[in-house]
A protein has these predicted regions:
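ATP-binding N-terminal substructure of ATP-dependent carboxylate-amine bond-forming enzymes
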Residues: 1-118
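Flexible, glycine-rich phosphate/dinucleotide-binding loops
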Residues: 20, 51, 126, 156, ...
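General beta-strand structural signal in soluble alpha/beta enzymes
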Residues: 44, 93-94, 119, 146, ...
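Short glycine-enriched loops at secondary-structure junctions
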Residues: 46-51, 97-99, 123, 219-223, ...
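Short, charged, surface-exposed secondary-structure boundary motifs
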Residues: 73-78, 119, 125-131, 178-180, ...
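Aromatic/hydrophobic pocket-lining residues that form π-stacking "cages" and hydrophobic walls in ligand
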Residues: 80, 103-106, 156, 189, ...
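Active-site nucleotide/adenylate-binding loops and adjacent lid/helix of ATP-dependent enzymes
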Residues: 124-210, 218-222
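ATP-dependent carboxylate/phosphate-activation module, predominantly the ATP-grasp catalytic core
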Residues: 183, 203-246
Length: 246
């Protein structure tokens, strides 16, 4: 395809932090730039001025700061409207779980502005939340480790009697710690509560080799594409830093 026939698109992407709990934005942008079918201009959307993806060569053509999800939908929409007035954004790709609800809520307003998104409904997002994962698995025939959602640290003792050790202590948005004792579980509870708030999810530990699969379906049960990946290097936040596709 010649350059003259390439479709020109301006795509805004979040998740530019590439630290020990990395966001997907940098990898998403690299994937977009590898596609030869489009003439792309990439707009980075960051929450902090020191996110590494802002300063990496060949990633974003221009970067704007946007408000944290806690600021609400109105603040986000106003900021995106300002960015759109300058950059004429065609597509926005949000990459964090914690920001998806706000982007879904403002989806119709973005569409009116001429900005496309490809997002689930609020109900679909809620159904695959960590808190609802076990019920989701039961409903759709997936084997999912048992879990308990707790709000009080005193509940760790009763849950440990049911699950046994080790257990996985998970934040409601991000991060997870494998606890081998009650003391380790309590420490993880306090740390995750301070960072992400309640509730905390306690999950049954499953031993074995972890394989992650990213899949694209047609919405009717047919898989269009699937890429399995095995993590080779894990950060202290439990995030994959290096891996191989299988």
């Amino acid at each position: 395809m010649t350059n003259s026939k390439k479709l020109k698109l301006t795509i805004a992407v979040t998740g530019l932090n590439a630290v020990d709990s990395p966001g997907p934005g940098v990898a998403v942008i690299r994937g977009l730039r590898d596609c030869v079918d489009f003439d792309l201009r990439i707009i980075g959307l960051s929450y902090e001025s020191l996110e590494p993806g802002i300063y990496m060569e060949g990633i974003a053509d221009k970067v704007y700061q946007i408000p944290y999800p806690a600021a609400g939908t109105e603040a986000l929409l106003n900021r995106l409207a300002y960015i759109h007035s300058i950059e004429k954004v065609d597509v926005i790709i949000p990459n964090f779980d914690a920001e998806l609800f706000n982007f879904i809520k403002i989806g119709p307003a973005l569409k009116e502005m001429g900005i496309a998104t490809f997002l689930p409904t609020a109900e679909q997002l809620e159904s695959r939340d960590k808190i609802n994962l076990f019920e989701f698995g039961e409903k759709h025939g997936f084997l999912v480790p048992k879990d308990k959602t707790i709000y009080d640290i005193m509940d760790l003792h009763s849950v440990s009697k049911e699950f046994g050790y080790p257990m996985v202590i998970k934040g409601k948005y991000y991060e997870a710690t494998v606890a081998y004792t009650l003391e380790q579980a309590q420490k993880a509870f306090h740390a995750l509560n301070a960072k992400w708030g309640l509730p905390i999810i306690v999950q049954e530990f499953i031993s074995g080799t972890e394989v992650n699969i990213a899949a694209l379906g047609d919405g009717n049960g047919v898989t269009i594409s699937a890429v399995p990946m095995r993590k080779l290097f894990i950060t202290d936040k439990g995030k994959a830093w290096a891996g191989i596709t299988l």
